From Swiss-Prot:
GO terms for molecular function: alcohol dehydrogenase (NAD+) activity; hydroxyacid-oxoacid transhydrogenase activity; metal ion binding. GO terms for biological process: glutamate catabolic process via 2-hydroxyglutarate. Its main location: mitochondrion. It catalyses: (S)-3-hydroxybutanoate + 2-oxoglutarate = (R)-2-hydroxyglutarate + acetoacetate; 4-hydroxybutanoate + 2-oxoglutarate = (R)-2-hydroxyglutarate + succinate semialdehyde. It comes from the Eukaryota. GO terms for cellular component: mitochondrion. CDD domains: HOT (cd08190). InterPro entries: ADH_Fe/GldA, ADH_Fe_C, Alcohol_dehydrogenase_Fe, HOT. Its EC number is 1.1.99.24. Belongs to the iron-containing alcohol dehydrogenase family. Hydroxyacid-oxoacid transhydrogenase subfamily. This is Probable hydroxyacid-oxoacid transhydrogenase, mitochondrial. It comes from Aedes aegypti. Catalyzes the cofactor-independent reversible oxidation of gamma-hydroxybutyrate (GHB) to succinic semialdehyde (SSA) coupled to reduction of 2-ketoglutarate (2-KG) to D-2-hydroxyglutarate (D-2-HG). L-3-hydroxybutyrate (L-3-OHB) is also a substrate for HOT when using 2-KG as hydrogen acceptor, resulting in the formation of D-2-HG.
Amino acid sequence: MMSKARISSLMKVISSGSCSCPAHSRSSTGGLNVSSENEYAFEMSSSTIRYGPGVSKELGHDLQNLNAKNVCIVTDRNVAKLNSVKVAFDSLTRCGIQYQVYDETRVEPTDQSLLHAAEYARQNKFDSFVAIGGGSVIDTCKVANLFSADREAEFLDYVNAPIGKAKEVNVKLKPLIAVPTTAGTGSETTGVVIFDYKPLHAKTGISSKYLRPQLGLIDPLHTLSQPEKVAAYCGFDVFCHALESFTAIPYTERGSAPMNPNLRPPYQGSNPISDVWARFALKIIRENFISAVFNQDDLKARSNMHLASTMAGVGFGNAGVHLCHGLSYPISGHVKKFVPDGYSGDHPIIPHGLSVVMTAPAVFKFTAASCPERHLEAAELLGANVSKANRNDAGSILSDVVRQYMYKLKIENGLDSLGFTRDDIQSLVKGTLPQERITKLAPRAQTEEDLASLFENSMTVY
């Protein structure tokens, strides 16, 4: 645990707004790892993806193919009871796979919940890992895998700067298979873990391409169990992943190229390949999102949203996100008493997708002037008629489209409905400043006053 002096020092860094994004930056060495040459390249990488209704029944065979002898299954108690998940467990039994179950995952993980999972993994000699659940489960499994591979590491060693030491992952991790049961985070495709660091009431993370699952089994049958609100909140995470990666600055404008290509950040800026996935996801959202939320038995709509989640994950996992996500971290980190429908009531939480979309109408109205064509195209992909639109109206048009989706899907009316007041704005701004590595991927730069205005304009949405 951190000393009080260390926490005080970090609070000063965070308040200064000069640090790198603690959720996604990889290195603490700053300019030592970059050249004087502007970025000229981008990379595209992802997990192997297998998609199809019922594909969970192949899990046992996949573990056989890995010659797995002692498997750690990370899930949570509610997910483990689902009939669709039992199919996955039955496949393990049928194939003679020996496994142990860790089901104490916390929705919206914290440093303590991740440390608990890591210690569990260290107590056993697992040769492979399987995550069956939503993004919280998959992220928890990534951490368990990492710290079981490096048994001497302290928790903050791999946590991103300035909170942690941002140690590079040099140990060999065990194979990890992700079976996402929600259509939202896309964590099955990324090497990023996000969690609440409670001593600072801040979101931070661990980021390395080596954390990325070896295989993602995308089985849309799991999504039929999602309650309405869970489907809506998770869907808006997909929604914003696609919009933010599509409107991020081009990869050539991100900054200097790294001295070593291995140090190229996971989030590189918009690029031609990520754009393909973003467009694909936005089109699916237009055609399926509303039905997927309100019709729990609409397998086609829920299947398509599950596919959109993965495709948007591939896109943003390489291009990045920007302001909606950067602003979301202090929103969820400063939760007061809000407990949403469809979630366990054992602790207040603001689900990730809800915290992200809360500021989206204000964000895209703010960023549009820097790349109006992109914003208009996004609005059109989501169903707006922009044939006679003026470039100067791009922000208002996309903002209205986002607002209409939120209204139709019965999303809470702004930060006020989550328990925030205007007195909280300065704290929310301070919580956003450390997310610079994300927020500077936005097509328009921001001052503290701009950030305050974005929160102000998000107090109510309708």
